[in-house]
Amino acid sequence: MAMLNYDYGAMILNQLEAKRRIIKYLKEHNIPYMEGLCGDAPQITMLYKGCENCPDKVLESSIYFFSDCAECRVYYNANGAEWVRISNCRNDLFRLFNYINAMIWPCGADGVGNNLYKPQHLYTPRLYMTEDDCFDIVLATVVNYDFYNVAPLETEDFLTACLPELLNNLSIPIFLLLLGKITVERAISIIETEILDKRGTIL
């Protein structure tokens, strides 16, 4: 029987090609970015303006391209981190993070009425506070290059639209809790009634 000769090398996506594709997407969507290095890993940093619920109405994001995967982190600016640092309610914040990480499963969408692809739960980001005394609140997810190769547009939309939108939506309960204006129970109630449907999917 004749063997089919597939070129598996053509299907492999490495860190440099992944970075090239992301940059192409950012340029096409007019998303400002800067390039750099984190150790030996190429890095792209982006700024999202118009995030109405966030400190200074901005969010920042970095994508790190490691040898076997990429990691995307979305986080508040330095003023947001300062609010975390001076807060006396961080223990309550960690309880809220526990709820969010257990119950929220963001669903990526194309933003044009499902004409390009159907909504899917592609990635499972986690929300945490960094342990480096910077007090950053970070929403992070890991991207497998092979999966990115299979679902490129879905992945790019998720990293640059879905994740920032989710953190922006969570900002009101997060910072009201940090400022001592509401309880953990009230923060959870806000998320359940204004952000989630009954399946844990973003409204």
Language-model segments: which ranges?
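Short, internal acidic amphipathic alpha-helical interface segments
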Residues: 75-136
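Beta-strand elements of well-folded, non-transmembrane domains
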Residues: 50-52, 78-80, 143-147
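Charge-rich, low-complexity N-terminal segments
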Residues: 1-74
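A short acidic/glycine-rich loop-to-helix N-cap element
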Residues: 146-161
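A conserved amphipathic terminal alpha-helix motif
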Residues: 158-177
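Short, highly charged C-terminal tails/helix-capping segments
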Residues: 175-203
